[in-house]
Design a protein with these regions (language model features):
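Aromatic (phenylalanine/tyrosine) cluster motif
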Residues: 8-11
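Juxta-kinase regulatory segment immediately upstream of eukaryotic protein kinase catalytic domains
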Residues: 16-19, 25-56
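An alpha-helical support segment within catalytic cores of ATP-dependent transferases
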Residues: 43, 50-53, 166-172, 176-177, ...
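Short Pro/Gly-enriched beta-strand edge/turn motifs at strand-loop
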Residues: 54-60, 97-98, 208
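ATP-binding glycine-rich phosphate-binding loop
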Residues: 56-74
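ATP-binding pocket architecture of kinase catalytic cores
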Residues: 64, 74-175, 184, 191-194, ...
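Conserved catalytic-loop position in the HRD/HxD motif
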Residues: 228
Length: 228
């Protein structure tokens, strides 16, 4: 198992239609907080420069989502719908992996946002808005069988991703990374979430099981991995 797609998929992939536009007369950008006034000014100057090419309406920019990083995402109305704007301070975030993997996914024929504009030195990006509704929002919890079609579509997308794999394109999902990921289970699930303490014999059993999992994964064909 090789090839880490995490830098891209931190942006939430969606199954929904584009959200409705902000009602006229509302200026939601006033509620967005900026730690640095100079970055706020640079952001609005850059966004205003996208009006001619992409029809954005800068006065409608509003918070969309955030992730476990310094990146922030905003939604902005346009003359044809909405777009997503990424704010990624270049001294804290490297957008190059995001851009590279976005191209990989689009080239594979997967449903992913296109990058419409990118100011690499400043860390601003304009993207397609593919919505905010996730698969978890639409699954039927009362009738699991009704979700079969959704899960098959998800599996088809993963197969398409794997079939597009090319060697030496993404960093390898090596033994060290696999071990680090597996270590999250005892540290975060058992200890933090379940409040369980395991003894030395249980830990030894876990370590042996993890080693078996790692070796079997390393022996399998190497393909792109969607870590989320």
């Amino acid at each position: 198992m090789s090839g880490d797609l995490r830098p891209f998929v931190e942006f939430r992939l969606s199954m929904s239609t584009t959200p409705t536009s902000q009602p006229s007369g509302v200026n939601p950008s006033a509620s967005i907080e900026w730690a640095q006034p100079e970055r706020q000014a640079a952001f609005h100057q850059w966004l205003n420069a996208q009006v001619a090419a992409h029809g954005v309406r800068p006065d409608t920019v509003r918070a969309a989502s955030a992730d476990a990083s310094f990146r922030r995402y905003f939604r902005v109305d346009t003359t044809h719908g909405t777009c997503i704007v990424m704010d990624a301070p270049p001294d804290k975030e490297n957008c190059e992996p995001f851009v590279r993997i976005a191209r990989l996914m689009l080239d594979a024929g997967l449903y992913a946002p296109r990058i419409l504009a990118w100011d690499e030195p400043q860390g601003f990006m304009l993207l397609d808005d593919i919505g905010s509704q996730t698969m978890m929002d639409v699954i039927n919890r009362d009738d699991p069988q009704a979700n079969h079609g959704l899960y098959m579509r998800a599996l088809d997308a993963l197969l398409t991703l794997q079939q597009s794999s090319r060697p030496s394109v993404l960093p390898p999902y090596d033994e060290a990374l696999l071990q680090r990921e597996l270590s999250l289970f005892p540290d975060w699930y058992l200890t933090q979430h379940r409040q369980l303490q395991i003894d030395s014999s249980q830990r030894e059993m876990l370590d042996k099981t993890f080693q078996t999992i790692v070796q079997r994964n390393l022996a399998a064909p190497s393909v792109y991995v969607h870590r989320d």
